[in-house]
Amino acid sequence: MSAPRDIPELDAASLEHLEAIARRAGEAILAHYRADQPAELKADRSPITAADRAAHTVITEALAAWTPEVPVVSEEGALPDAQVRQAWRRFWLVDPLDGTKEFIQRNGEFTVNIALISDGEPVLGVVFAPALDLLYLAGRGLGAWKRQSRGPAQRLLSHPLPPGTPLVVAESRSHPSAELEQYLTTVPVKSRVRAGSSLKFCWIAEGKADIYPRFGRTMEWDVAAGDCVFRESGDGRPRTSPLRYNTPGLDNTGFIIGGPASDD
């Protein structure tokens, strides 16, 4: 176990530690996944399961032990007031189980998302799909990496897309929208692929898809870790993302990730 730190270093050791935390949370999730336990509804009518709560406990306790002076914001925890958060330069942003609908549907497309936010941008991030044993990891200046079934990590390197290239579009499995359909009439589309959770960001990073347009509201913990993987997949320089973090509502109104414009 790494010694407690006030601020995690942006180094390989921190990536390894972050991976270990995500895998521990994944183990907690899979214990409930195999038990096929029922879901409940939160006040906002979104689903929550015992797996969400178990992963939240694993992650928040591990982060508090590792970086005790860095605040943690988790979807399943108490949310600090915006005025309090505006004084933070760095904080952890966590979705313990992103894709609860996918968890309930038992299609494997749910993830553990953990990101370190520094001055409004994600600088460390891990996305782990425990049912698929698939992990994506990134850090500022450290690149983006993919690891399948605890095999060797593979570096993810993107290349700019020439204008007019027919695009493979990543889209949400659970959130179709008329706005998306309208947008897709304005760009050349080669094919469309669907997935749950933050895997869509990772697909852009590894070149499995070219663009991920999302319309409608999302929360920052839904996207931060995947956004970090996307940003650090650039070939020699970070990729440009429209997303910023620690906004007053901790939310986004829509975004387009990838495509030729992301590499300008």
List each model region and its residues.
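Conserved beta-strand segments of alpha/beta enzyme cores
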Residues: 38, 71, 168, 188-191, ...
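Glycine-rich active-site/cofactor-binding loop and its immediate structural neighborhood
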Residues: 88-130
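N-terminal subdomain of lithium-sensitive/metallo-dependent phosphomonoesterases centered on the IMPase/IPPase/PAP
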Residues: 1-97, 178, 182-185, 261-262
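Acidic beta-strand-loop-alpha-helix segment within the catalytic core
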Residues: 114-202, 251-264
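Conserved beta-strand termini and adjacent loop/short-helix elements that scaffold enzyme active sites
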Residues: 42, 75, 172, 194-195, ...
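Oxyanion/phosphate-interacting regions
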Residues: 1-20, 181-186, 201-264
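Acidic active-site catalytic centers that drive phospho-/nucleotidyl reactions
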Residues: 52, 75-76, 95-98, 200, ...
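Residue-level signal for inorganic ion chemistry
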Residues: 29, 52, 63, 100, ...
